[in-house]
Curated annotation (Swiss-Prot):
EC number of the protein: 5.3.2.-
Family: Belongs to the 4-oxalocrotonate tautomerase family. PptA subfamily.
Taxonomic lineage of the native organism: Bacteria, Pseudomonadati, Pseudomonadota, Gammaproteobacteria, Enterobacterales
Pfam family, one: Tautomerase
Source organism superkingdom: Bacteria
Protein name: Tautomerase PptA
Record gene name: pptA
Organism of derivation: Klebsiella pneumoniae subsp. pneumoniae (strain ATCC 700721 / MGH 78578)
GO (cellular component) term, any one: cytoplasm
Amino acid sequence: MPHVDIKCFPRELTDEQKTALAADITEVLIRHLNSKESAVSVALTQVEPDAWQAVWDSEIAPQMAQLIKQPGYSM
């Protein structure tokens, strides 16, 4: 704990880029949540643009009040 699941449109990231992204996210969580490196997990879930509405409907819109960074768009 914590676990972060990054959802985004498909990107062609190399394994090196994925590793760097995970390291950066982990560093932020260690700094701000006082987590241990061994407690952090990071997932990268790539969602096709035509399937993003489902992410919005199930994960973003219902939790808008709890989001610590809200999107600058609506659906």
